């Protein structure tokens, strides 16, 4: 097992990509902790994947985030791996139709929320080193025609640059920071973004050289590489998975 007894925190781990990552990491021997404000969904996921520990926490609340980290440290003694995965997709709107509340909601969850968790974790991780994995998107690397999600793409591009910055800042503490840029993945969140899921999935699949859209498992195995000692000499890397 590649993650035997490692303590892993996965934000957004109760569904979609985060759930797939959590499930694989548990199989690899990790003690996985999932924070979320949706307790019902948390309990369901924790039971399904045999999750070690789950905590009610709103990623938009500094107090909730700090309390969650304090509970984890008290119970497990430290955090070896942080997966910054939580994220939401906006309703498709062009720039002139976006109001500040729309913008702020996406930025608060997709960017500032990841900052909150990383800041709270890194103080403890500095003691023994660790790995931070940021889940971004290919929408943070390039623009797509008719994809009206300005706050989303801004948040994902920002996570890419924070990956590079944090990798340099904390290399001397033996903390590796890497990023995965996922393309279109078959999740409930992605499907809710499309008006006609079946047609959109088929058309999107055709745009990929391998002829299909991604699965949570595709992203989970890429995350496992960055979480494990297989990538012990890798930091600041941006890995497209598409």
Located regions from the model:
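Alpha-helical segment proximal to the catalytic Tyr-Lys
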Residues: 123, 168-172, 232
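Substrate-binding pocket helix/loop in short-chain dehydrogenase/reductase
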Residues: 93-95, 102-105, 200, 204
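Residue(s) in the substrate-gating loop at a strand-loop-helix junction
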Residues: 137
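C-terminal substrate-recognition "lid" of short-chain dehydrogenase/reductases
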Residues: 2, 175-176, 212-241
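Active-site helix of classical SDR
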Residues: 118, 155, 163
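A glycine/serine/threonine-rich, flexible loop-to-helix segment
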Residues: 47, 146-148, 179, 184-207
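Conserved glycine-rich cofactor-binding loop
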Residues: 14-15
């Amino acid at each position: 097992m590649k993650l035997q007894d490692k303590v892993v925190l996965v934000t957004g781990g109760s569904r979609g990509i985060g759930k797939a990552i959590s499930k694989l990491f548990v199989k690899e021997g990790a003690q996985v902790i999932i924070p979320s404000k949706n307790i019902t969904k948390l309990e369901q996921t924790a039971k399904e994947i045999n999750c070690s520990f789950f905590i009610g926490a709103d990623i938009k609340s500094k107090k909730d985030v700090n309390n969650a980290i304090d509970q984890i440290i008290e119970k497990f003694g430290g955090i070896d791996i942080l997966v910054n995965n939580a994220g939401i997709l906006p309703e498709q709107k062009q720039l002139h139709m976006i109001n500040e509340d729309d913008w702020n909601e996406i930025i608060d969850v997709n960017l500032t929320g990841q900052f909150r968790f990383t800041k709270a974790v890194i103080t403890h991780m500095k003691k023994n080193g660790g790995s931070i994995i940021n889940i971004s998107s290919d929408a943070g690397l390039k623009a797509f025609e008719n994809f009206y999600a300005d706050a989303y793409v801004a948040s994902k591009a920002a996570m890419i640059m924070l990956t590079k910055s944090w990798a340099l800042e904390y290399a001397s503490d033996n903390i590796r920071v890497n990023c995965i840029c996922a393309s279109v993945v078959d999740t409930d969140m992605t499907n809710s973004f499309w008006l006609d899921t079946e047609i959109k999935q088929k058309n999107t699949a055709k745009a990929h050289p391998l002829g299909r859209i991604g699965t949570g498992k595709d992203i989970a195995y890429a995350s496992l590489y960055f979480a494990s000692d297989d990538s012990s000499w890798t930091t600041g890397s941006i890995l497209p998975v598409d």
